């Protein structure tokens, strides 16, 4: 006889859901005792026997096909015991003793006894079933034995709300078919004759396979065939009964129906487990993939930013000087373009990088994953260090550019200064030689000679004054030579020409003075009068010009005191006008006296005073102008006085309202701070109270609008200060915005606490206890605890973190969870996250391993085909690409290790 173990050694099966021995859902004796009532009539009805044969044969073949074989005749094919032992191995997932190879009756009996002993070892009492009857092909005993196997391995573990196997299966059917019309499952015979119950079970779990609304209760054959064909085609449940056998039997066989229905139960319960396991894996993988994308984005952004810094620093450290200011200015323009165009996006990238890093760490912490550690050299601190190096190089580069530009500007300034002074000097000397050589004094009158002498004296003074300019020109030329100015040759040529011309002017000046002194005579009186006129006319003319400027000066005042000061000064000015008028008349009298002397002595005057250009006509014209401006000034000052009085009224009006609104805002800010600390009642009560408080604040807005209207009037009046109040409109606006922001932030904090409480299943009492403990140790009300404050808070909540080695280790572990960035502060949200993790369940690596084990059919490995069948395509490929090959002794080609993959997801091993 062929050894079936050797023939099927390539097939290995994991234990099924019903292979846990006698310990699943009650003892075998209990349900067998219950089944005694079902087997009272040992003489099978022929119709029932036919149904049992077909059902039991199909049920056995549904399992034997896994081992590559099947049976045709149920009471013949099990006689040698070989396929019976193989069936038990497949459905139990356990090895039976090695079968005997002989073909004699004794060998067959021994093989059947091995199978019966295995059944008995599972707690099954075999009543009146012996190996000899099975070997002899006793149909009744064979069907009874198969029914016992079905009960033990397919129905026993079905338990709904602690019911027995049969009752549990019936209750499951009733619940699944309850929503369907014309279906009322009360038993496992009559309730199934019309086929609607079978169709309802399929539609409940796979609605796309059955159009239930089109089925008719009066067409049972069609209904049954439809259900059996769909189950065989799409659910892998073989056809165990014929529709005609069920319909043509007054009471279908209960065992056959139970066997058929149990196949539906196992098909749908297995699919549900697989779906649950797949959903759990998908959820875990989705979180892991999202985190990996964030990590990749961080690495890419960090690399790009560090590369940009690496390229930019050498450019900023380049200190090669240029020869011209235009070249240096181009460098400065490039630097400004860098500051204006290139750097700001990088500043934004750096900020976004830090935000992404913090967001990633938060997501990892919330999903119970290890903290993200960037590649070496790409930490946030590394980027900050590189950025500081960039800033230092940038600062030094700017200083160097400015120093170089200042140096070149000094050279250009010196050269320009030389050109300007040289041009002024050359313009001044233009015509001077011709003037000094002119012999106009030979035919001049006495007054002309006097004028020429004075003019020559003035020229000599001017000449002496220009001596400094000539010396400066020479000094600048010397400095340009020392600094190696590129145009030194032209500078030296021009400087030499100026010096030669200067010497010639000195010689000509001396000669002309000697000639004028020889002719200096006559008529000093007229000359003295002209001089006296000039001395007094010039100051008086200046006084009138200053007075006209003051009278026409635009004044800007902001207070009544300032305008009253201007009015007082103007009154004082008007009191000086009589004295000024007398001075004017005295000056005009001097001019008239000179005219009288010249006429009486027949002296021909040149017509103008040689000492001044201020004529009597100019003095009279300006005096009339002053007389006209005085009343205009009076009118303007009075108008301004009226305006300032109106402004003072606006100031007082604004101050009165501001001194009410400002303290109100400050009081509300203090009350919000107190409310956020006390936080009495439930979170919902706190939220409701805060929102009512927010509405009371919003209702106060009309007072602020009134203040805005008053402020608008002040702005239109160009009033810039107000001594009647310390509150400015900007101060009020900032306070108002801070008030709205504070109440909104406080409301948001409570809403987040509610979300955290609901998401983590934290009770109201726990949340209040957490808030009370946190507030108690938050001494400065800053919203965060330091390490010592946090430790004291944990101790108050019962955590063993005392000052010993074990307590310190536990505290350091907790700090690494709540403060992964080592900032030294623990926020209330981080505190709540930690406490919620400590008090609620989270997904673990063991849960993921258990889920994969379900998908793998309880094997220690999983195949790519199984992953693609149970998971979405993208996540299936993700797992296949990352799972290591399985190396266990039971490995098959293509086996993948899902255990190491699952632990790697949670940082417990390397992926």
Curated annotation (Swiss-Prot):
Residues covered by the Calponin-homology (CH) domain: 50-154, 163-269
Spectrin repeats: 293-403, 413-518, 528-639, 649-752
Main location: nucleus
GO molecular function terms listed in the Swiss-Prot or TrEMBL record: actin filament binding; calcium ion binding; transcription coactivator activity
Keywords: Acetylation, Actin-binding, Calcium, Cell junction, Cytoplasm, Cytoskeleton, Metal-binding, Nucleus, Phosphoprotein, Protein transport, Repeat, Transport
Record flagged with keyword Calcium: yes
Binding site for Ca(2+): 778, 780, 789
Modified sites of kind N6-acetyllysine: 114, 214, 592, 625, 779, 859
Location of the region described as Interaction with VCL in the Swiss-Prot/TrEMBL record: 12-26, 40-61, 108-126
Phosphothreonine modifications at: 249
Subcellular location: Nucleus; Cytoplasm; Cell junction; Cytoplasm, Cytoskeleton, Stress fiber
Cross-referenced InterPro entries: Actinin_actin-bd_CS, CH_dom, CH_dom_sf, EF-hand-dom_pair, EF-hand_Ca_insen, EF_Hand_1_Ca_BS, EF_hand_dom, Spectrin/alpha-actinin
Keyword Transmembrane tagged: no
Chain's role: F-actin cross-linking protein which is thought to anchor actin to a variety of intracellular structures. This is a bundling protein. Probably involved in vesicular trafficking via its association with the CART complex. The CART complex is necessary for efficient transferrin receptor recycling but not for EGFR degradation. Involved in tight junction assembly in epithelial cells probably through interaction with MICALL2. Links MICALL2 to the actin cytoskeleton and recruits it to the tight junctions.
Name used for this protein in its record: Alpha-actinin-4
Natural source organism: Bos taurus (Bovine)
